[in-house]
């Protein structure tokens, strides 16, 4: 997609069931109204932090609303793999976060291959960026450092940067961004966890090809 800055393009990837899946799990599986019990997010976060990376074999393919990149399959369906009686809601919550992070890793690898450049870091915004656990999972699954920004509203900030350049306050988008975008924190990948997730990603990426013929229409 063309960039509004001086030159160049940016690559966009999209997961149709991102944080939506967390709310779906809480509302539909746990039967909890987050409006009446907002502390459930903190409780699940604490429970999931007690679970080892990899969720003791529980893996979730987060295709509840089909999948865009990397497969672009409107018929794709979500999948829960490796469920045992030893798993609890903390495992499920962590497995959801890990599944979304795995998808981000696959999308990033595809972009890096397409453009021939390496991604060094991620900048997180929005509600998910407030989760210490999720930031660490993203860092560990990708092997890249994760930045949290001082502003959660990237769209508004981007509009402000564009307006500042148009008004002549800055000579370029680069200069405007350097003055208006600020990093609040950095999460570094854990080397041991990164190795475990790298092994899990090898298994994870086999799930979709293995099950896609099961749910295809007419089969």
List where the protein language model places each region.
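Active-site core segments that coordinate phosphate-bearing ligands/cofactors
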Residues: 1-125, 129-219
